[in-house]
Amino acid sequence: NYDMGMDGASPLFAGACTEPQKELLWQKLQSPEHLWCACGLSTVDQSAPYYRRDGYWNGAVWMPYQWMFFKSALDAGLVDFAYRIADTALTLWQNECAESYCCFEHFMIESRRGAGWHQFSGLSSPIVQWFSAYYRPGTLTTGFDAFVRHTDWAPDNSTLNATLDFTAAGRSTVLAVLQPGSKAVTASVPCTVTTRHDGLLELTFALDAPCTVTISIHP
């Protein structure tokens, strides 16, 4: 793959990769020598000959494409990497807003500061979605390969019943944010449940084939 930009890794969320290709691309995305940096995913592999320290595109961090790879990480069951993308972006954005009170277009990798137009609110949508995905009770978040057919939340968001259609086999993670407190989880197929913080449940399924899954989460 001679395309060392983020679009070179886009076959991951297009479903166009072989298993060896998936493994290699995920390695590159998580490697600090390639696409991962202290403030998120670089637009261009940091080892690329056309990577620029002062780049507008070829050497910066933008939020929208990171949302795409966050969703793909959920599809791949890479729950820790999905969280790393979201948490890094939220921290970066919060630090810049506290310092400048601006809503910047993109971020420079070396300085970790906002750059470009300072009132570019349209690119802030992923920030709002990441916050909701991890911290807003009443939020259910999936990757691209899961379709939420039905949800039934308790009025206080302490209970959730949901039906999801998974369109691909393999590992896949779903995030559910409920009111804090201990929860019991039942599902129509086996799943692994982790609690990153009180109220957030990360449900990871290992699916043999595309299928419909029902989930019940309650105190």
Question: What kind of feature is each model-predicted range?
Answer:
Residues 1-32, 55-157:
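C-terminal capping/lid segments that line or modulate ligand- or cofactor-binding pockets
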